[in-house]
From Swiss-Prot:
Record's keyword annotation contains DNA-binding: yes
GO molecular function annotation: DNA binding; NAD binding; NADP binding; nucleosome binding
UniProt-listed InterPro entries: 6-PGluconate_DH-like_C_sf, 6PGD_dom2, 6PGDH_NADP-bd, GLYR1_PWWP, HIBADH-like_NADP-bd, HIBADH-related_NP60_sf, NAD(P)-bd_dom_sf, PWWP_dom
Protein name, entry field: Cytokine-like nuclear factor N-PAC
Domain commentary: The A.T hook DNA-binding domain is required for the interaction with MAPK14.
Subcellular location: Nucleus; Chromosome
Region of interest (Dehydrogenase domain), ranges: 261-553
Amino acid sequence: MAAVSLRLGDLVWGKLGRYPPWPGKIVNPPKDLKKPRGKKCFFVKFFGTEDHAWIKVEQLKPYHLHKEEMIKINKGKRFQQAVDAVEEFLRKTKGKDQASSHNSSEEKNRRNSSEERGKQSAREEKRKASLSEGKLKKGTGEGKKRVSSVSSERGSKSPLKRAQDQSPRKRGRPPKDEKDLTIPESSTVKRVMTGTVAGFKWPPSVSEPVKDSDPHFHHFLLSQTEKPAVCYQAITKKLKVCEEETGSTSIQAADSTAVNGSITPTDKKIGFLGLGLMGSGIVSNLLKMGHTVTVWNRTAEKCDLFIQEGARLGRTPAEVVSTCDITFACVSDPKAAKDLVLGPSGVLQGIRPGKCYVDMSTVDADTVTELAQVIVSRGGRFLEAPVSGNQQLSNDGMLVILAAGDRGLYEDCSSCFQAMGKTSFFLGEVGNAAKMMLIVNMVQGSFMATIAEGLTLAQVTGQSQQTLLDILNQGQLASIFLDQKCQNILQGNFKPDFYLKYIQKDLRLAIALGDSVNHPTPMAAAANEVYKRAKALDQSDNDMSAVYRAYIH
């Protein structure tokens, strides 16, 4: 097949990493967004997903030539919305082109009419002048003098009048009341902003808005630029125009998880063990995105809701692993993770060569390394993938996934990670994800303790806690986490979104991690003591924000 030339403005199908092809348009990147070195690539704005990314030429295909092929292999709702947006955009653009052609024709007719009226006026003036000259020749001397005077006076005005009436028309200009309001596009602009691919000419505008665009998929891959802050400002400014034309309000990290609605679910059978706060939301999203899921939970009643949604029931962890291709597990702590694998009818009994096990629990590096060794010793494949987030983010499919271990298995889990999270990171060998997750939760737990300490200090010094929150929300610390946890405290609502006992467990494990490399963690140690006091006050099963009560009792 002959190579197809692509240019700025072309509509294309773009393939980004392991994600399915998606309709987009080649556009100009912001000035501060550097182009990747190496192979030729184009900056593509994807319809409907809010994505912008550099895509290599070999990963781009002309939209019209491959439309039927792509529609057959992609069936997601979000994908169909994107295709509809492209088609609507093309229909409207075609209508605008026809209207422009019609207006140009009318304008040409008006100009021709004006020129014709000018010529008729000139002929009439010439005829009148000829008649006047004939009368002068036949008149008396006095008459000649009088007529000559009048004729002279008329002759002094007529050329001026004729010049006024005719000169603009001779140049083909319309009268002032018929002024052409169309601003012609320069050939240079037209050449830059439009292009031809396989015989199709693409208009310079961008697509129309996609209805129900998901507001969650809105963050940008700043690692492509050496000046993240400057780049973010530049691209935000540049995309204000695109916002009006496409409904795009922000940009998504292009090398991470694609839009949930566009997922092509894997044909592999998925198992899931553990339906707690996090696991329940994860399974729900896997089912919504079309995955075949078998579930198991220590308390079987929790499985009922998911059975109604289309999941299958596994009687034991071993049965789930033996009947599924990839089995995920999300349990509370290291002991629960080990019991699930090594206990009676556990995961290990169902492992055979080729079976895959993904542990999403937040545990220490030693525990996850031990689990990996026993799984691999039976011929299985292992991946650790703890998640950063809370119950709400789990329900929304907006978790951050930290993975390490078998890279091939990480790729095989692509559609699952897309369903449950907004982005995923592969961190290398087993143990790295566990360490990173503990560090993340150490920072989060320490921050929560500091928030509670600040609110209680405001109270005892006679300051308004609400005013403190308002001030924090207007400053550099402003975040959804800060606002939600402060609201929990102000309203006295400690319904668990992230159990206090689990954040204290993570702090303890993070401190042990620091001890193992002789690294001091005094802030985490202090926060850990406050959480231990809160647990002593019977706050273990409340949200982590209940640490506030450790300061007021």
